[in-house]
Curated annotation (Swiss-Prot):
PANTHER family: LEXA REPRESSOR (PTHR33516), LEXA REPRESSOR-RELATED (PTHR33516:SF2). This is Transcription regulator LexA. Induction: Expressed in light grown cells, strongly repressed post-transcriptionally by UV-C light, repressed by H(2)O(2) and SeO(3) but not by SeO(4). Strongly expressed in dark-grown cells, induced in light-grown cells by glucose, repressed at 20 degrees Celsius. Not induced following UV light exposure between 150 and 600 J/m(2), suggesting it does not respond to DNA damage. Despite changes in transcript levels, protein levels are constant under light-dark regimes, anaerobic growth and in presence of glucose (at protein level). It is found in: Cytoplasm.
Amino acid sequence: MEPLTRAQKELFDWLVSYIDETQHAPSIRQMMRAMNLRSPAPIQSRLERLRNKGYVDWTDGKARTLRILHQKPKGVSVIGELKGGELVEADAEEVEKIDFAPLMKKSSVFALRVMSNDLVDDFIVEGDMLILRSVTGEEEIEDGELVAASIKGGKIAIKRYYQDGTKVVLKASNNKGPGQELKASDVEIQGILMGVWRNFQGV
């Protein structure tokens, strides 16, 4: 790609850092503050140059759609797939990357350590770390999702969540019965399960 001027590189490096940390594009005003500029014109000019040189792109007419192009993938390499217990290696030129860093930077993500085998029916065992994200007030929770829930401000427990009209049903993983039916107002969802971290190194 065509090289950048010092001013263009300064803005580009800041954009890469900002988007990597926040997972969304900044506003023009934020770019102005970061570059110590009082007018949007220089920012818009630099952005156009970055776009023409193939470093960034955005959707015209829509705010905060700027994205970085041709960024080198980060994270853990997925070197292949296991089928029937045998490794099928991935194409060396098309190795997928899984980047956990953006997830871990979000303030809405938290972890709970599992200290029993009560969740074994969900393939979660003692020592596992549950990775959850906080729930916003307006968010709809899908039936059957594993959630961290508290009842009337009590202790938090991991349950499967079901909505039944104005009521909520919470079911324990090891309970084959109908579950606990509660008023929705009595249940506070602290988080939704995103994934499970299992460490085989004994750390």
